[in-house]
Amino acid sequence: MGHIPQTDCQARPAMPVSLRNKTRWPATMAMIAFCILLSACRNTDPDAFTRVQAWPLPTTSTPSAQPDLVVTPSDELLLSWVEPTETQHRLQLSRFQPVDATPRWAPTRTVASGKGWFLNWADTPHVYALEDGSLWAHWLRSTGPGRMDYGIDLVRSGDGGKSWSEPHMVNLGNSLGDHGFVTFWQQANDQLGMAWLDSRQRAVMGSMAKGESHQHGAGDHDHHGKDAMMLRGALFNASVRQQGEWPLDASTCDCCPTSSAVTDRGTVVVYRGRSANEIRDTRLVRFDGKTWTSPRDVHADSWQIAGCPVNGPVVVAKGNTLWVVWYTEADGAPELRAARSQDAGDTFAAPVTLAKGPQVLGRASLALADEHVLVAWLEQSQDDSQRLVLGRYDHALQNPRQVEIAQLATRGRASGMPRLRVANGSAWLVWTDVQSGQPIVRGASIH
């Protein structure tokens, strides 16, 4: 089997280390079922979300990478990942039903396969489920001669993933430049909202220099103003036809993932902004269904950095309460911060430090439970290996408790972006590790 190609931002994986307390599939699934039933019977549990179990995934073949994990309106879980074939790549999808007495995976389905995909450790495909039962997915496809010319292919399934629409290129006209770092939300029962980072204005500037290649890496992002990446948003109907598109911010960080959540006052999108003097702090915009607010800072960290840190913010919401988690080095050291808003993002309380020090890698994922806020992030060990950590907090971001989820064999950026979700009273977490020198997606359930 072929390997998943890596961009120049990636580091090759090292020798594998298995998840701690690895068990056989039947025993593990039985334990998961027991913990689910147990958690349903408890109103308050001082040890909630500290009991870690291996979660067997359908990603049994290697290599597999770039996982995404989402909760459906029926409280099921959708897991997607990318794996290679002999000549191309395919986006795989499976559904997990944690609500049953015996949790199980549905048969894996292929969303799409093809050549010429753009695969990157941070800019990964996403899946989503709307209340009308439809499933949506996207991946990145090369669109031009340059390595960084790629666009967003969007598809929809109305039959549970058995069949999919023809891919729709979100950036119309197959415009050159890079377009990615997508976030999805439900705008209506049958309407998908999405936001992404878009380089059309930078591509126009670049085209003025004939023959100049359009490249970017972790330290190459030194543009701003009309030569900067921008944030755009759009809505799509059940026919995968665009029903509006908006420029949301004309100057953003180049390759930090975006995130979104729905409040009672509309959808909030968070992302890393970029000022003319290279201040790259977390910003927020909100959409009420008709208009978008102007960008505003979640907090004025005043982190000045000439290159993109590839470390975007994440957000969850309930009612008009928002929680945002982000990475910064504004005080001279790697730090993971969180802040809460109780007015749908108009104002935020002072940020809380979740983790700080040279070991903090960030790449946070965020989920909300009935009584807790859960945050997963990566840290680096002294031997350059990595570990995956889960932090549990109350809704005021107080009373912290941390638990180690796994020791990873992979190093650098090959570990990708962890994905954390809460469904049926338990937390579910997936990430990329290595096995026999190849990337593989692993999982854990936390009860």
Give a label for each model feature.
Residues P5-T7, G219:
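Exposed, low-complexity/repetitive linear segments and helix-based recognition motifs
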Residues L37-A40:
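C-terminal motif of bacterial Sec signal peptides marking the signal peptidase cleavage site
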